[in-house]
Amino acid sequence: MERTLRNARVATFVYFALNGFLLGMWVVHIPAVAHAVGIGHAVLGWLLLLLGLGAFAGMQLAGPLTDRLGARTVVPLGAALCSAAVVLPGLAFDTWTLGAALLLLGFGNGCLDVSMNAHAVQVESGYGRPVMSAFHATFSLGGVLAALIGARTLDRGMAPAVTLAAAAVLGLVVAGVTARALLPAAARAATAEDAGTGTPAGRRTPRRIWILAALALMLMLCEGVANDWSVLHLRDVLDAPAATAALAYGAFSTAMTAGRLLADRLTGRFGPVAILRHGSAIAALGLTAAALSPWIPLALAGWAVFGAGLSGCIPQLFSAAGHADSDAAGVNVSRVAGLGYLGMLAGPAVIGPLTHLVPLNLTFLLPVAFCVVAAGAAGILRDPGPEPTRQGVRPRTETV
C-alpha cells in the first residue's frame, strides 16, 4: 500500500508539472502566434477569454466525471486532450481558427486541472498529512521549464507549430506512461450510487463549498492582478526601466513557488486555518507596501511578500473542498477551481476600468481588501466533521 501511495504521489507531481509545462509553452509563444495570425492586443485579449471559458466548461464536466469514473480514468484523458490541443494555436491561420484552438486548449486544461486536483486530495487522504501545496509548486516549476525551453527555441527561430507539436507529443507520452501509477477510484463513491443515493453530480452543493469558491475567486483574482499588472506598475507608476520592471513578476512568482514548497510543512505544524489567515494578511501587507512605495526596491520586495503570502492559500481551499465529501470530491473541487479561475481572468478586467478613476497603484487596494476578507473568513477551513485533525486532513481510509 505504501509503495502504491508513493507512486501515486509521484504521478501526481508529474501531471501537475505537465499541466504547468503545457500552459507555459503556449504562454511563451503568444507573441509569435499573434504575429503569425495578424491580430493586435485588443483582439488577442478577447481570444484569451475563450481560453478561460473553455477551461471553466472543462472543469464543470470533469468534476462529475471524476466522481463517477475516478481520477485514474479522467486525469490521463484530460492530460491527453490538453497535450493534443496545445499544438492547435501554432497551426491557426486566422482569428477564427485561433479562437477555436484556444477554446479546445482551455477545455483540456480545465479537465486536467480539476481531475488532477481531485486525485491530489485522494493522495493527501492516504498520507494523512498536507501535501497539496507541493503539487501546486510543481505546476509552477513546469511553467518555468517551459519558459526556458520556449525562449531557447524561439531564439533559434523555430516555428511555434514545431515546438508546440513536440510539446504535444511529449505530453501524450507522459500522460500514457504515468497513468498506471494513479490510484483507483474510491470504493465509497460506487457504494453510494449502488445504494440509490444518487450520483454526486446530482447533489446540492453545500454552502461551505460556495464560500470556499468565493474565497478562491478573490484570492485568484489577486494572483491575476500580479500576473498582469505588476510589471506595468513598476514601469508606468515608478518609471522603472523595462528590465527592472520585469523583475516584479519574477519576484512574485519566485516567492510563490518557494512558499508552496514550504507550505505543506507549515500547514502540518500550524493547520490550514492559520496558513490562510496569516498568509492572506501577509499578502495584504506586501501588496500595500508595493502599491504605496515610491521606491523601486521596496516595491519589488512588496510584490515578493505578496507572492509568499498567497502561496499557501489556494491549495488549502482546494484541499478543503476535496475533503468535504469524498463521494463528491470532483464536483466540489470543480466549483472552487472554476470560480477561482474566473477570478484570475477577472483581474485585468476589474483593474483596467478602475484606472480611469484612480491611479494604477491605488487600484491595488481592491485586492488588498480581498486578502483582508480571506483572512477574516479563514475559519471556514475548520473541519466541520466529528473528528477534525490539526492538519485539516482526514486520516487514511479505504479510499486508497
Label each PLM-derived region with a short phrase.
Residues 58-71, 154, 259-272, 355-356:
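Helix-to-loop junctions at the C-terminal end of transmembrane segments
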Residues 57-96:
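Conserved MFS/SLC helix-loop-helix module at the cytosolic interface between two early adjacent transmembrane helices
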Residues 33-34, 65-66, 152-157, 234-235, ...:
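Interfacial helix-cap and linker-helix signal at transmembrane-aqueous boundaries
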Residues 161-180, 364-380:
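Symmetry-related core transmembrane helices of the 12-TM Major Facilitator Superfamily/SLC fold
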Residues 28-42, 228-244:
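Short amphipathic helix-loop junctions that connect adjacent transmembrane helices
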Residues 2-29, 35, 103, 206-222, ...:
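Pair of pore-lining "gating" transmembrane helices in MFS-fold secondary transporters
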Residues 111-125, 312-325:
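Intracellular juxtamembrane helix-capping segments at the cytosolic ends
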Residues 38, 70, 91-96, 239, ...:
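Helix-breaking motifs and short loop linkers at transmembrane-helix boundaries and internal kinks
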